[in-house]
Amino acid sequence: MFHGSMVALVTPMHPDGALDWEGLRRLVDFHIENGTDAIVTVGTTGESPTLEVKEHIRVIREVVDQAQGRLPVIAGTGANSTREAEELTRAALEAGADACLLVVPYYNRPTQEGLYLHFKAIAEAVPIPQILYNVPTRTACDLLPETVARLADISNIVGIKEATEDIARGRQILELCGDKLDLYSGEDSAAMEYMLIGGRGTISVTANVAPKAVHEMCTVALQGNRKAAEAINTRLCPLYAALFSEVNPIPVKWALYEMGLIAQGIRLPLTVLSERYHELLRQALRQEQILQ
């Protein structure tokens, strides 16, 4: 249903933490102009944990309104409360989002049966395409491939963002689910391999700052052209590393500030990128000719 380079969009903020609506609209246009295939808003990179519910919903609406159908908009609507996730997913549907991204419930660490019933309840309650999001390093809870296969039988669960670097797990999901569910990488460093084994794209942090390059890498990888994909991927590796020098989205927001696209705002408990990483990130941006 969705494919290619899907940017995990940051949520621009002013230095005092207020949301920067002009900056958000500017980013949407930047991605449309530079070949991004879809926008994923208010996910991990979009700082959803520190947004108020009304802010969360308004960000979705602003992105949808600015996109004007020029590319798909996927809204992060996951929560560790099933009821809250249903409410956010319904709000995203009403706002005009094309699909929703639902993270595995964090902190309360449900069983596999609890995970199955959680996602099943949301899918049955809200008729919008839904993409599962497994990121065990953040949630302390792992959605196993066997549970993904059960969920793939639900018609509006259409994909999974697998944020691990485990290529064998990606293959297992594809084998268990077949064409019932699309696989997306949630780790930039593993994205190329995920697509070469049959994944449909990546939900990418790096695409925030290098949208053309990530789009080009996805295009050739989806065509099965390993040589061309590896050439771009190898070139991007220093940028992948620099963008995770501190926890995401700290480095990518600083990079976008350096590029002149957003203000230097981030909400506590996250903080602005430590000065010791500034030159590392500048060098990676210069190497990709993003900065002069």
Curated annotation (Swiss-Prot):
PROSITE patterns: DHDPS_1, DHDPS_2. Keywords: Amino-acid biosynthesis, Cytoplasm, Diaminopimelate biosynthesis, Lyase, Lysine biosynthesis, Schiff base. It is found in: Cytoplasm. Pathway: Amino-acid biosynthesis; L-lysine biosynthesis via DAP pathway; (S)-tetrahydrodipicolinate from L-aspartate: step 3/4. CDD domains: DHDPS. Its main location: cytoplasm. It comes from the Bacteria. Its EC number is 4.3.3.7. GO terms for cellular component: cytosol. Pyruvate binds at T45, I203. One of its GO terms (biological process) is lysine biosynthetic process via diaminopimelate. GO terms for molecular function: 4-hydroxy-tetrahydrodipicolinate synthase activity. It is an enzyme of class 4 (lyase). The record marks T44, Y107 as: Part of a proton relay during catalysis. It catalyses: L-aspartate 4-semialdehyde + pyruvate = (2S,4S)-4-hydroxy-2,3,4,5-tetrahydrodipicolinate + H2O + H(+). InterPro entries: Aldolase_TIM, DapA, DapA-like, Schiff_base-form_aldolases_AS, Schiff_base-form_aldolases_CS. Disulfide bonds: none annotated. The active site is at Y133 (proton donor/acceptor), K161 (schiff-base intermediate with substrate). Homotetramer; dimer of dimers. NCBIfam families: dapA. Catalyzes the condensation of (S)-aspartate-beta-semialdehyde [(S)-ASA] and pyruvate to 4-hydroxy-tetrahydrodipicolinate (HTPA). Belongs to the DapA family. This is 4-hydroxy-tetrahydrodipicolinate synthase. It comes from Nitrosococcus oceani (strain ATCC 19707 / BCRC 17464 / JCM 30415 / NCIMB 11848 / C-107). The gene is dapA.
